[in-house]
Amino acid sequence: MRRVVFNHKGGVGKSTIACNLAAVSAAGGARVLVVDLDPQGNSTQYLVGKAGRELDPTLAGFFDQVLGFPLKPKKPDEFVHGTRFDRLDVLPSHPALAEQQGKLEARYKIFKLREALVELDRQYDFIYIDPPPSLNFFTRSALIAAESCLIPFDCDNFSRRALYGLLEDIDEIRTDHNAGLMVEGVVVNQFLPRARLPQKMVQDLIDEGLPVLQPYLASSVKVRESHESAKPLIYSHPKHKLTQQYVALYAALETKRQNAVRESGRSLDLSLRPFLKAVSTRPQPDALTPAQALPVEGGETQWTQHKP
């Protein structure tokens, strides 16, 4: 499963969501790769800390190879690096990506990332792609390479306005390049349950037919602490409420995905245009119960093991 976490508005928690879902996947037994397409390298730093600046080769090296004709080209897995977390790898970013964009667009290399990640599918159960917060070559490459898309949503008017334009961009990619791309849902981030505006905004999205995922992710200072320690929440704060929400979100996504494959023999198509009136009339499968999904006494976590 190749899953892109996409929003062309910055500050909505895109990298945080991608890395924490990836970490929960890995902690649950899956083999996971995070692909950091953002020249800022936030996901790379989150997973490997300051050592991320020294990693070589990186995605910039991969795209250099795409632009050139090396005598002995590296295979995609040669650009991958391990992290200190079991079963969790990273294909790291580099600031040079920003300088490569124009050349890659001019030579129409937009399918090269997809080709590389399809080759890596054999080694991983999940590939999480973190593109830049803008609609550019790297973002389009990510949407073409992905099988599914998660959309982070921060509860403010700017995010809501951007959301509908974003769905149009996804639909254009589906029409022109990647007909199989599905929208798994909207991930509500930094949610304040006691504030009226966030509640109203989320309810409006639901009323308009958008697939809003549950649980909503709470706002917490623990996110910044986990950034500082370069340890996703499942490793840095395993018992925290927000960590439990990430576990439940991952479980809900997995349940939905596995049920869809079981029922139809193929991936569930949740693609939609803005203001789509109906995605599905069936109730979504429940997430794991607290006894299955949440940390228990003694710091251990009970899991439903991932089965590739």
Which positions does each model-derived feature cover?
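P-loop NTP-binding core
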Residues: M1-P308
